[in-house]
Amino acid sequence: MSLNQKKKACIFPGTFEVFHDGHLNILKRALKLFDFVYIVVAINNTKTSSDLEKRYQKVEEKIDSLSIKNVEVIKWDSKISDFAKIKTIYFIIRGIRDVNDFKFEKYIADIYKQEWDKLEVVYFFSEKKLENISSRKIINLNKGKNDYEN
């Protein structure tokens, strides 16, 4: 019997340019609802992403350093819905910080449903103290840019 038949699992997909406290918060909250979480470090063709292998390694190191159980970090270069089908996972978790995120996430959820109608997206709203954190802001700060530069 596979893990997914015994336990309720979900997918936490993202490019994870920086796996930050907002992501970690969503992961910990998801583990309260799900028995197992696959963090899927993915490619987003609409974003400029750093090397998939490097991003995967950074996320895996972070999870290992925190000794978080019932999580597996995966690198994936295809559709998230394909990963879900292969693993027979019906839930994807996503975070929402604001109205702009909501619009984008609704669009993405519709795509997931078109690709595989068994998928459901479970949303976690950012905690107030974390809603201004984003990978892009962290990258820009590290480069000495303000929040609005790309």
Swiss-Prot record:
<feature type="binding site">
    <location>
        <position position="23"/>
    </location>
    <ligand>
        <name>ATP</name>
    </ligand>
</feature>
<feature type="site" description="Transition state stabilizer">
    <location>
        <position position="23"/>
    </location>
</feature>
<dbReference type="InterPro" id="IPR001980">
    <property type="entry name" value="PPAT"/>
</dbReference>
<dbReference type="InterPro" id="IPR014729">
    <property type="entry name" value="Rossmann-like_a/b/a_fold"/>
</dbReference>
<feature type="binding site">
    <location>
        <begin position="130"/>
        <end position="136"/>
    </location>
    <ligand>
        <name>ATP</name>
    </ligand>
</feature>
<keyword id="KW-0548">Nucleotidyltransferase</keyword>
<comment type="subunit">
    <text>Homohexamer.</text>
</comment>
<keyword id="KW-0963">Cytoplasm</keyword>
<comment type="similarity">
    <text>Belongs to the bacterial CoaD family.</text>
</comment>
<keyword id="KW-0808">Transferase</keyword>
<keyword id="KW-0460">Magnesium</keyword>
<feature type="binding site">
    <location>
        <position position="105"/>
    </location>
    <ligand>
        <name>ATP</name>
    </ligand>
</feature>
<feature type="binding site">
    <location>
        <begin position="15"/>
        <end position="16"/>
    </location>
    <ligand>
        <name>ATP</name>
    </ligand>
</feature>
<comment type="pathway">
    <text>Cofactor biosynthesis; coenzyme A biosynthesis; CoA from (R)-pantothenate: step 4/5.</text>
</comment>
<dbReference type="GO" id="GO:0015937">
    <property type="term" value="P:coenzyme A biosynthetic process"/>
</dbReference>
<dbReference type="Pfam" id="PF01467">
    <property type="entry name" value="CTP_transf_like"/>
</dbReference>
<keyword id="KW-0173">Coenzyme A biosynthesis</keyword>
<keyword id="KW-0547">Nucleotide-binding</keyword>
<dbReference type="InterPro" id="IPR004821">
    <property type="entry name" value="Cyt_trans-like"/>
</dbReference>
<feature type="binding site">
    <location>
        <begin position="95"/>
        <end position="97"/>
    </location>
    <ligand>
        <name>ATP</name>
    </ligand>
</feature>
<comment type="function">
    <text>Reversibly transfers an adenylyl group from ATP to 4'-phosphopantetheine, yielding dephospho-CoA (dPCoA) and pyrophosphate.</text>
</comment>
<protein>
    <recommendedName>
        <fullName>Phosphopantetheine adenylyltransferase</fullName>
        <ecNumber>2.7.7.3</ecNumber>
    </recommendedName>
</protein>
<dbReference type="GO" id="GO:0004595">
    <property type="term" value="F:pantetheine-phosphate adenylyltransferase activity"/>
</dbReference>
<keyword id="KW-0067">ATP-binding</keyword>
<dbReference type="GO" id="GO:0005524">
    <property type="term" value="F:ATP binding"/>
</dbReference>
<feature type="binding site">
    <location>
        <position position="80"/>
    </location>
    <ligand>
        <name>substrate</name>
    </ligand>
</feature>
<dbReference type="GO" id="GO:0005737">
    <property type="term" value="C:cytoplasm"/>
</dbReference>
<feature type="binding site">
    <location>
        <position position="15"/>
    </location>
    <ligand>
        <name>substrate</name>
    </ligand>
</feature>
<feature type="binding site">
    <location>
        <position position="94"/>
    </location>
    <ligand>
        <name>substrate</name>
    </ligand>
</feature>
